[in-house]
Amino acid sequence: MLILGLNGNVSAAGADVVPNLNELYMHDAAATLVRDGVLVAAVEEERLNRIKKTTKFPSNAIRECLAAAGAKPADVDAIAYYFPEDFFDDIFQQLYTEHPSVPTRYSREMILERLRVDLGWAAPPDILHYVPHHLAHAMSTYYRSGMREALVVVMDGAGERNCTTIYRSDGAELFEIASYPVPKSLGMFYLYGTRHLGYGFGDEYKVMGLAPYGDPSTYRDVFSTLYSLGPNGTYELIPRGGVVFRMTTILREHGLQPRRRGEPFTQAHMDFAASVQETTEQIAMHVIGYWARSTGLRNLAFGGGVAHNSTLNGRILTSGLFDEVFVHPASHDAGSSEGAALVVARERGERVWPLPRLTNASLGPDLGDVDSLERTLKSWSPLVDVERPDDIVEATAHLLAAGEAIGWAHGRSEFGPRALGNRSILADARPKENQTRINAMVKKRESFRPFAPVVTAEAAGDYFDLPETVGHHDFMSFVVQVRADRRELLGAVTHVDGSARVQVVTEETNPRFHRLVTRFGELTGTPVLLNTSFNNHAEPIVQSVDDVLTSYLTTSLDVLVIEDFVVRRRTELPLALEDFTIGFRPVTRLVRRLADVSAGRPGAPEVSHEIYLDHTSGPRATISAAMYELLTHADGVTPLGSLGIELTGELLTELYDLWQGRFVTVAPVGDGAGSAP
């Protein structure tokens, strides 16, 4: 039986289902394909449409999942969706009242339309099944844990009516034993704390990285007024049901002004972040601890967006409450697409247990065969030199040992927000300056944010204090302590509090990556690398060969290693761009504005030009008149140098900056860079 699991909303690639759709509506779009209970393929739509945390319908992800399975739409027996139908339709009804010009249509009709229009799939209405949200989360994390009897905890921003649901399993079925209503949401509590620090939805991990620089005792008394812990794992957020909306007011009354985006961080901001993290941990541990003790269950499967708080997970690991803890690599909403598929499989009589523990998250599309890869690399030859060493792992290990920062792309991409050795940026984990160096070269992000280490399973205990509780460190899910005698050595990956979000790689789960870390250890004496996601600040993790080359060419990484090839820049950008085509993403928009010419203002009206990405929180940039003219002539087919526009150095630099910000696409002639905006 072949079952397709989906999440995301029904927006088409170039437009939202209603104007200015909120980023919280059906985020983290993804598709998952399950065959006879086995996870065949899974990929987030953001990897393909290049919009972080996209809400768009996952048409591209569906296409890639089917391709990975060698299947056609007609082979699919059922489609599972990660929220109930009436809940989804109620959301649409609310949106229609806010946008009366939008025709009233509902989810089943619109999902089937997207399948037909985007994929040519005339799916029958009864192929579509809807699943309760938290049950989908619970199924994905429990049935991939390898556990039999377990406590299953789902914590996130919100399901239909609940923010936390507790289950227990006897090895065959999940039984719901408790739930907590949405007004008590720890996910929303953390989000509003995140917004107070000048960040937005999806930036919660930045607050987690900032927290160790702060002292939670500074504002502990203030935060203690926001919640109370009760008996039997209960708690209240104070004022009841309204803390997330009143947090800013309450904190302002205590002298804590919200930070504006782009402002420097003060110690007060760091102390505030520490308090947000501490409060979240206190409440979560109160809930999880009670249910662990009351059920007597010694195994925990933890899911939902809150389960990506790896600092909290580290605390669970050291609490002594459990013998084993499993966190799904895609615990956020993307992973619920898999859980929804498993629910439907079970409802249709398929046995989905027992399943072995998930140890490898490499479930996305690969980079193609060698011939297609060579053709693509050759098409980019005006910008890069390519060589094929006899032993790519040996060559890469020597480059890393020599201090090079490397983009590393191999095999199928990872499912979830972590780069685990298939779409990674790698560097020596020892020099402390590598943290600031990688930030400057690639990420252009806040200097306080830590990088993660990857270590071989054979050496993990020599460098990190791994708790006795089995934590399964395959997916960077847990923050642990770096051994005190190793912290100075591992300067690039040891956080300010001596911690690290460690990945342990084994020969069985990722042979090539394990061999690379092992060989680096043989050359340097330290089998630990800095491992961070392969992307710049303006994009999701890279997926395709063109994504990989684009990211490499718009950062300052020293070398790119893609499959068995070593790639280096051969010329200085942006001067060589004239031989390439310029195109546009489906969400790219160009605007020319005339200033308001009120009476009495002499002269011609002032003109300004802007480019922006038309999606929630999409960036904007002011562009020159010359750039506006260039982009209005670009068609994704004609080389830049043949457009009849004078290409000054200043104009090419401006174009390169737009490419770096992913406002435009650049492609070799013949590849097609996208249509006009």
From Swiss-Prot:
Function: Carbamoyltransferase that mediates 3'-carbamoylation of the noviosyl ring to produce novobiocin, the final step in the novobiocin biosynthesis pathway. Novobiocincin is an aminocoumarin family antibiotic that targets bacterial DNA gyrases.
Family: Belongs to the NodU/CmcH family.
SUPFAM superfamilies listed in its UniProt record: Actin-like ATPase domain
EC top class, as a word: transferase
InterPro entries xref list: ATPase_NBD (IPR043129), Carbam_trans_C (IPR031730), Carbam_trans_C_sf (IPR038152), Carbtransf_dom (IPR003696), NodU/CmcH_Carbamoyltrnsfr (IPR051338)
Pathway membership, UniProt: Antibiotic biosynthesis; novobiocin biosynthesis
One annotated GO molecular function: carboxyl- or carbamoyltransferase activity
Its EC number(s): 2.1.3.12
Originating species: Streptomyces niveus (Streptomyces spheroides)
Protein name: Decarbamoylnovobiocin carbamoyltransferase
Xref: Pfam families: Carbam_trans_C, Carbam_trans_N
Listed transmembrane segments: none
UniProt KW keywords: Antibiotic biosynthesis, Transferase
Domain of life of the native organism: Bacteria
